[in-house]
């Protein structure tokens, strides 16, 4: 499989070439801006003064002054932070560059049969008769970058590729010609200042033109060889006319193909949840029905006019080969990049609303299914009710503390002490209601008079899903119960979505563990599950019955109240109405939007598969080896006393399907011996695959991010796809970053931040210098730069005004009083900060903060000399300090063996994993394993953050006592905690979690490597000198990551030794007390917490 080899110079060099490419006309001057260490501050001031003398300065004069500066300041004492471009005259007009591509290869718009008008890619004025009807909602790419920029970036990428890979450049050029020609034919869609495409631009162009240009360019950027070229070509051409079903059609054969690889050796999960190699060998087998399904899918593709893709699928189907399976996986991943399918909500929910109810169902099965749900819920909650769990007793407080800032369904104008705010946010409504004594936990009706407003969720290759936006009372009613159920699911392996510690690798080892030639793996996609109408009545009724049984287990009034409102929420939703096109329409199904959606679906899904398997047991003799539910999907392995034959498999599959249909559940049930495909991952031939389907030039919905933030998202998405086997041109990605991070100052003046800003961990970080690994620049220069950057604080007047308002103050006070017996400053600060942070999702506040930060950054990038440094200790300081007493002793070449558990990973990562081994569990990065956290959890609904826990255990014994006392922790427990000096253990545990957090061990590739691998003992030579376990831990972890980084960057394994004395350890330990975390758009997008 082709991996694109990055012949990547430096970002700064690339950016310079890009600017020359864009500003390809006479009247341009470039000015480089530098940052230098404090002792050369004067030289920078001098340089800036000398070039700002006259009005218009020539390039030669700038260059001359720059040379003087560079001669005076040594290279290690300075770095380039930005380029300022003065461009007089016409911008390197994209349209002029496109002209040379002609119109010969242009595509033509044509309506599709059976598609709604707006889903056709036809001339906009044929869909919307006039301006007043027009909306861009169904084609809006929702990203702050334009078709022009994307074309510019693609043309530049091609011109760069011609220098080192002429053959592939020709492929890209051929594909780009189709796009350029089509743009020449219809005209370039020009966006307004908010990157929206308006009626004037679109009226005489095909409606989906902009979205098509974006997704096509994205697909071109993925082309690395003939195979990817052919896929991209076919999808680009076909997606111009088919805007509805293409992705679904192209990806549906996959379900059958995953079952067609034999297993020849695989990794399995052992009893102690580790992966080990097993040399089991299983031949594949598929039923006649599956083969027919496959041929049917291929026929549909050909009817749609596709050639290469169906031919390739069919050829592979006739002679399956593990070595070419990654090519099949590529088609599967590519299909998502045709973009989102955005439907009108009325069309999206039409199916769900018009579900026909059948009385002709198997009542026996229904009864069993219903009882299973009821018993499961009863079992989960029983002990918690008997022991009067804090979360149930204080259900209301618990819910208020974790009240999200999602929409409450109605727009209100709220006056926060003079600051007027128009918002739909739940948290703001609650604060306001409590202040005005309008707050109540009574569940409002959702009947024909108060229908539920709908939100939307768009996914490539599927229909748009509707989301209920319920009043916050529903959240309060369901929160505690749902949390308890989720916690229970964390300990039950059947719930693979929630099972704790498990990452996807573990779930994979679970499947391969039980497979053999006597076993059938059945997997079912229950995607219509939510909409199946009677299923819902039955679900809600079972929940209510379980709740009524639970109520008899306790006399606690508060818990009775909690159960009552929970039951009320179920009864209301059982017969709910939704608001579509200003009409209220009856709808009884489960819809996402409730707190319990995910966990209830899983519980019901498990009950469903158990019921169906139970019914099958009356026909066959088999053992159920495992059952797993994961969201909409369920899969199970059943072992027979005899070897599976094609006849048995076929019979079994059709029986499985018929039992599902006896319950009138519309599902796609399949069975195989060696592989399965569910929404999140697929297993084939004993190997694990993920779909690389994250869109890069399209977003699902518009949010309040600036283009700068979106550049960070773009990079993070590129990394996710690369780790899943879809490599995009890195040149293209860096070019997009260069465009999207640039800041327009005036019409003629643009500022481009450079790598030293964009790749340094500060609030402005966007990408990593080396893909897959995080580098923390550590030199005196970069630490000074980082300190200056961290002094740029984001402020928001609106947020400050709200925080000062009587409403906000009294709300925080209320939470405080309800939580603690006597006011504890640490807790009240924690609450106030959390509540204030929730305000950030309110658009005007987020915008105000970012704008403020950017305007300061712009002046910094032009003249860094006037800025004060902030004295903060960051992870860089720590690593800089450690770098002083370690040395690299030797390095050997990383062995060529690759770990093939996940064949689609980049080769260098597979080699690294083969050497160090795969990680099967996550590290505690929240401090939840510490005793202090556990004690508070037992007696209170408050969850302190890691910073707060850290602060507490480092305080005096009396302060710790006071902290516990304010949560009503019994004296006996506190005494035990203090007398056994548990806080010393906690210091270590919490700091450990904090360090894991700081070093981002759950980022990208790091989450795959076993950081506790015994291999590291050979490469980190460290004999600790002092009794400072935290410092030792910090050094060890930092060096392990250093070794991994080196493997990825250089393909070498280094051996590092530590030469520290006692004072070094103590100094490091003290430093660790004060380390602060850095948040940036980069970290927001790249860290996977849970």
UniProtKB/Swiss-Prot annotation:
RNA-directed RNA polymerase that is involved in both transcription and genome replication. Together with VP3 capping enzyme, forms an enzyme complex positioned near the channels situated at each of the five-fold vertices of the core. Following infection, the outermost layer of the virus is lost, leaving a double-layered particle (DLP) made up of the core and VP6 shell. VP1 then catalyzes the transcription of fully conservative plus-strand genomic RNAs that are extruded through the DLP's channels into the cytoplasm where they function as mRNAs for translation of viral proteins. Residues 506-678 form the RdRp catalytic domain. It is found in: Virion. Its cofactor is Mg(2+). Keywords: Magnesium, Nucleotide-binding, Nucleotidyltransferase, RNA-binding, RNA-directed RNA polymerase, Transferase, Viral RNA replication, Virion. GO terms for molecular function: nucleotide binding; RNA binding; RNA-directed RNA polymerase activity. One of its GO terms (biological process) is viral genome replication. One of its GO terms (cellular component) is virion component. This is RNA-directed RNA polymerase. Interacts with VP3 (Potential). Interacts with VP2; this interaction activates VP1. Interacts with NSP5; this interaction is probably necessary for the formation of functional virus factories. Interacts with NSP2; this interaction is weak. The keyword Transmembrane helix does not apply. It catalyses: RNA(n) + a ribonucleoside 5'-triphosphate = RNA(n+1) + diphosphate. The keyword Transferase applies. It is an enzyme of class 2 (transferase). Belongs to the reoviridae RNA-directed RNA polymerase family. SUPFAM superfamilies: DNA/RNA polymerases (SSF56672). The lineage of its organism: Viruses, Riboviria, Orthornavirae, Duplornaviricota, Resentoviricetes. Transmembrane segments: none annotated. Coiled coil: none annotated. Its EC number is 2.7.7.48. Pfam families: RdRP_4, Rotavirus_VP1. Signal peptide: none annotated. It comes from Rotavirus C (isolate RVC/Human/United Kingdom/Bristol/1989).
């Amino acid at each position: 499989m082709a991996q694109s080899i990055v012949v990547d110079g430096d970002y700064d060099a690339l950016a310079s070439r890009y600017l020359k490419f864009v500003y390809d006309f006479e009247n341009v001057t470039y000015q480089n801006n530098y940052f230098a260490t404090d002792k050369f501050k004067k030289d920078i001031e001098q340089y800036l003064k000398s070039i700002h003398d006259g009005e218009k300065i020539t390039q030669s004069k700038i260059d001359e002054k720059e040379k003087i500066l560079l001669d005076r300041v040594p290279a290690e004492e300075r770095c380039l932070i930005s380029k300022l471009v003065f461009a007089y005259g016409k911008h390197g007009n994209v349209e002029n560059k496109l002209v040379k591509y002609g119109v010969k290869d242009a595509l033509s718009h044509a309506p599709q049969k059976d598609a709604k008008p707006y889903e056709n890619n036809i001339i906009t004025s044929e869909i919307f008769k006039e301006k007043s009807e027009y909306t861009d909602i169904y084609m809006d790419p929702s990203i702050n970058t334009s078709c022009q920029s994307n074309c510019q970036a693609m043309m530049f990428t091609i011109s760069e590729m011609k220098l080192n890979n002429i053959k592939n450049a020709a492929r890209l050029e051929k594909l780009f010609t189709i796009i350029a020609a089509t743009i020449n034919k219809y005209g370039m869609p020009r966006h307004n200042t908010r990157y929206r495409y308006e009626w004037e631009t679109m009226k005489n162009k095909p409606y989906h033109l902009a979205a098509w240009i974006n997704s096509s360019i994205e697909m071109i950027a993925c082309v690395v060889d003939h195979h990817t070229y052919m896929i991209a070509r076919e999808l680009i051409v076909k997606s111009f006319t088919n805007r509805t079903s293409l992705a679904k059609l192209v990806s549906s054969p996959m379900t059958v193909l995953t079952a067609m690889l034999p297993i020849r050796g695989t990794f399995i999960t052992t009893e102690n949840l580790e992966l080990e190699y097993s040399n089991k060998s299983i031949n594949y087998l598929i039923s006649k029905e599956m083969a027919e399904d496959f041929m049917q899918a291929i026929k549909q593709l050909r009817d749609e006019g596709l050639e290469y893709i169906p031919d390739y699928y069919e050829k592979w189907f006739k002679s399956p080969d593990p070595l070419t399976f990654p090519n099949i996986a590529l088609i599967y991943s590519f299909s998502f990049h045709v973009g989102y399918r955005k439907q009108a909500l009325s069309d999206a929910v039409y199916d769900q609303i018009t579900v026909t109810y059948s009385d002709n169902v198997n009542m026996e099965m229904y009864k069993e299914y219903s009882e299973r749900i009821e018993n499961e819920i009863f079992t989960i909650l029983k002990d918690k009710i008997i022991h009067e769990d804090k979360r149930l007793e204080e259900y209301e407080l618990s819910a208020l503390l974790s009240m999200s800032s999602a929409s409450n369904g109605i727009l209100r104008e709220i006056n926060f002490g003079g600051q007027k705010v128009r918002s739909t946010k739940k948290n703001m409504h609650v604060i306001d209601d409590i202040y005005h004594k309008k707050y109540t936990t009574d569940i409002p009706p959702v009947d024909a008079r108060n229908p539920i407003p709908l939100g939307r969720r768009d996914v490539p290759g599927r229909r748009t899903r509707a989301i209920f936006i319920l009043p916050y009372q529903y959240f309060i009613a369901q929160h505690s119960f749902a949390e308890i159920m989720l916690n229970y699911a964390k300990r039950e392996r059947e719930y693979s979505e929630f099972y704790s510690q498990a990452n996807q690798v573990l779930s994979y080892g679970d499947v391969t563990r039980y497979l053999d030639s006597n076993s059938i793996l059945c997997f079912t996609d229950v995607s219509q599950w939510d909409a199946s109408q009677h299923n819902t009545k039955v679900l809600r009724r079972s929940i209510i019955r379980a709740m009524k049984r639970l109520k008899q287990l306790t006399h606690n009034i508060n818990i009775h109240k909690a159960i009552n409102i929970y039951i009320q929420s179920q009864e209301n939703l059982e017969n709910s109405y939704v608001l579509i096109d200003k009409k209220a329409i009856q709808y009884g199904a489960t819809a996402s939007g409730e707190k319990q959606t995910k966990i209830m679906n899983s519980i019901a899904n498990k009950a469903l598969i158990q019921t169906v398997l139970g019914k099958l047991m009356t026909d066959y003799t088999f053992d159920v080896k495992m059952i797993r539910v994961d969201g909409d999907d369920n899969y199970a392995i059943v072992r027979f006393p005899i070897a599976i034959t094609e006849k048995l498999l076929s019979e079994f599959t059709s029986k499985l399907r018929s039992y599902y249909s006896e319950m009138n559940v519309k599902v796609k049930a399949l069975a195989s011996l060696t592989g399965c495909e569910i929404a999140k991952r697929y297993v084939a031939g004993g190997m694990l695959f993920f779909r690389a389907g994250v869109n890069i030039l399209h977003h699902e919905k518009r949010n309040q991010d600036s283009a700068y933030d979106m550049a960070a998202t773009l990079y993070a998405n590129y990394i996710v796809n690369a780790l899943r086997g879809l490599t995009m041109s890195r040149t293209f990605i860096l070019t997009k970053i260069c465009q999207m991070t640039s800041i327009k100052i005036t019409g003629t003046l643009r500022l481009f931040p450079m790598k030293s800003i964009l790749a340094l961990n500060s609030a402005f970080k966007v990408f990593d210098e080396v893909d897959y690994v995080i580098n923390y620049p550590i030199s005196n220069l970069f630490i000074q730069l980082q300190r200056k950057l961290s002094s740029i604080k984001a402020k928001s007047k609106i947020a400050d005004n709200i925080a000062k308002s009587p409403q906000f103050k009294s709300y925080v006070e209320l939470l405080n009083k309800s939580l603690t017996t006597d006011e504890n400053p640490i807790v009240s600060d924690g609450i106030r900060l959390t509540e204030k942070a929730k305000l950030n999702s309110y658009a005007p506040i987020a915008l105000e903060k970012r704008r403020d930060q950017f305007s300061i950054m712009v002046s910094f990038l032009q003249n860094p000399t006037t800025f004060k440094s902030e004295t903060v200790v960051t992870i860089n300081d720590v690593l800089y300090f450690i770098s002083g007493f370690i040395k690299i002793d030797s390095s050997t070449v990383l062995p060529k063996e690759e770990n093939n558990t996940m064949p689609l990973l980049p080769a260098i990562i597979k080699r690294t994993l083969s050497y160090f081994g795969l990680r099967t569990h996550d590290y505690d990065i929240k401090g939840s394993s510490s005793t202090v956290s556990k004690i508070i959890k037992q007696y209170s609904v408050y969850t302190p953050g890691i910073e707060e826990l850290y602060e507490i255990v480092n305080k005096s014994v009396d302060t710790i006592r006071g902290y516990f006392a304010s949560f009503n922790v019994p004296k006996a427990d506190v005494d035990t905690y203090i007398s056994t000096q548990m806080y010393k253990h906690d210091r270590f545990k919490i700091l450990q979690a904090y360090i894991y957090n700081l070093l981002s061990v759950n980022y990208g590739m790091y989450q795959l490597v076993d950081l506790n691998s015994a291999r590291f003992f050979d490469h980190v030579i460290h004999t600790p000198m002092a009794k400072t376990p935290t410092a030792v831990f910090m050094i060890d972890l930092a060096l392990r990551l250093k070794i991994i980084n080196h493997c990825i960057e250089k393909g070498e394994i280094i051996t590092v030794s530590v030469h520290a004395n006692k004072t070094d350890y103590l100094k490091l330990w003290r430093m660790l007390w004060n380390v602060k975390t850095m948040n940036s758009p980069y970290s927001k997008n790249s860290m996977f917490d849970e």
